[in-house]
């Protein structure tokens, strides 16, 4: 028997190193010049990737950012949880804007479906939690992953067998309606109405459904480059994030293998995305926090400025993001977990005009000095940040495309981030448009 073909294409994983919203969408779009396929491997439509192309803003939630490049194939892997309603709404929005989607989008038959009862449970739980809410987007992501782990999930391929789908749906509704009515004080969902809503999606999805794992292997064997587009960020990872204030999937680079069906040896370069400062949406500890719109005790003027200049509002929820200084100790944890090859720093221009810039390089935790983010939200909440201070710069970095054009103080700040992180900065984003980028090392070439 002959050995499997060795990958000839080069694969890059783009991963968030913070609490999401790092600017991954723009970077994926920029790098897609050198990739023939872009893959989503986890999460659902709770993550919004914002792209500014030619001054026009596009927000993608499910479909990979590569869809904005003509001729690039886009894949939704088995690790994603899929809302057909959200998917087709996004497809309609893109195609009405002249973007061809259906002929370029491929969906794994093993992808877990989000059903109406997942959304109902998600919203009802947050209401019941009250002040202790996690801060989910209410889109059914967590409950869908729960069903997957409990081995009762319905998958895309199940839509192609209506009798089987109906049987499994009835079983699931019996279970979830009990939870809704008896524990969450929510009305039961109707079986027939749910079935009638879901079954027609089978015919609409069928032309896009394929064996994604096999197609990715074949693409690499043919010499094509692939990009794996992470959603959310490392500090929201179900295992490695600030648990329990996390998302319901693994957001780290290693999950690109499991969530798309490729071997881990096929992940050749890990590009970690970090803002020049930190943001977080929803609840959970944030050691270097300066500003939280919902917390009167967190109204530092610099944090307010970061939020306003950086336009820090959730692209999916519209919720204001909490802001703070860049946390290099948390970044160090993310780099280790992901095996990051190089960093891309985004939104450097948001720091323009600040007299002083701070960088969190460690913490005091229960009287001890540590230089890496601890595990678990309780420990993180007790961390007191240890800062280094840097002089700011008054000249604008917006839109710059060359390292030498950066102010010397900005260069010094970036070099110190590299030193603390222990890996090089490969790219710097100086604005929202794809061309407002400084390239130092190319993930597909260096």
Curated annotation (Swiss-Prot):
Record-linked SMART domains: Adenylsucc_synt
Cofactor binding, per record: Binds 1 Mg(2+) ion per subunit.
Subcellular compartments: Cytoplasm
Active site, renumbered: 21, 49
Binding site for Mg(2+): 21, 48
Record-listed IMP binding positions: 21-24, 46-49, 137, 151, 232, 247, 319
Alphabetically ordered keywords of this record: Cytoplasm, GTP-binding, Ligase, Magnesium, Metal-binding, Nucleotide-binding, Purine biosynthesis
Quaternary context: Homodimer.
Family listed: Belongs to the adenylosuccinate synthetase family.
Identification of the protein by name: Adenylosuccinate synthetase
Organism whose genome encodes this protein: Ralstonia nicotianae (strain ATCC BAA-1114 / GMI1000) (Ralstonia solanacearum)
């Amino acid at each position: 028997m002959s050995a499997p073909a060795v990958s000839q294409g080069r694969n890059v994983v783009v991963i968030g190193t913070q609490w999401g919203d790092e600017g991954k969408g723009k970077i994926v779009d920029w790098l897609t010049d050198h990739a023939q396929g872009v893959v989503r491997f986890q999460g659902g439509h709770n993550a919004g990737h914002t792209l500014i192309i030619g001054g026009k803003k596009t927000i993608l939630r499910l479909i990979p950012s590569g869809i904005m490049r003509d001729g690039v194939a886009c894949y939704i892997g088995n690790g994603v949880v899929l809302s057909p309603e959200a998917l087709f709404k996004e497809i309609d929005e893109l195609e009405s804007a002249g973007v061809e989607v259906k002929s370029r989008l491929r969906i794994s038959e093993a992808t877990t479906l989000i059903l109406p009862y997942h959304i109902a449970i998600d919203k009802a739980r947050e209401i019941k939690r009250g002040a202790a809410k996690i801060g989910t987007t209410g889109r059914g992501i967590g409950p869908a992953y729960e069903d997957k782990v409990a081995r009762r999930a319905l998958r895309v391929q199940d839509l192609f067998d209506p009798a089987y789908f109906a049987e499994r749906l009835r079983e699931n509704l019996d279970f979830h309606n009990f939870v809704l009515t008896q524990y969450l004080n929510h009305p039961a969902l109707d079986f027939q109405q749910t079935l009638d809503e879901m079954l027609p999606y089978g015919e609409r999805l069928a032309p896009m459904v394929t064996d994604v794992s096999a197609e990715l292997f074949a693409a690499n064997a043919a010499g094509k480059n692939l990009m794996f587009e992470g959603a959310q960020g490392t500090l929201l990872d179900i295992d490695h994030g600030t648990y329990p204030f996390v998302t319901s999937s693994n957001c780290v680079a290693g999950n690109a293998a499991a969530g798309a069906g490729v071997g881990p040896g096929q992940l050749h370069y890990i590009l970690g995305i970090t803002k020049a400062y930190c943001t977080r949406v929803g609840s959970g500890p944030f050691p270097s926090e300066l500003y939280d719109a919902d917390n009167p005790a967190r109204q530092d003027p610099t944090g307010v400025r970061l939020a306003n200049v950086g336009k820090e509002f959730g692209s999916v929820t519209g919720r204001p993001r909490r802001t703070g200084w860049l946390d290099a100790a948390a970044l160090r944890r993310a780099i280790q977990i992901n095996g990051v090859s190089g960093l891309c720093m985004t939104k450097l221009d948001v720091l323009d005009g600040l007299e002083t810039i701070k960088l969190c390089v460690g913490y005091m935790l229960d009287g001890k000095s540590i230089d890496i983010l601890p595990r678990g939200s309780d420990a993180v909440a007790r961390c007191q940040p240890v800062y280094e201070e840097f002089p700011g710069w008054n000249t604008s970095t917006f839109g710059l495309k060359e390292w030498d054009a950066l102010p010397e103080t900005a260069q010094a700040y970036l070099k110190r981030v590299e030193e603390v992180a222990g890996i090089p900065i490969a790219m710097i984003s100086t604005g929202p448009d794809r061309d407002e980028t400084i390239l130092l090392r190319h993930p597909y070439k260096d």
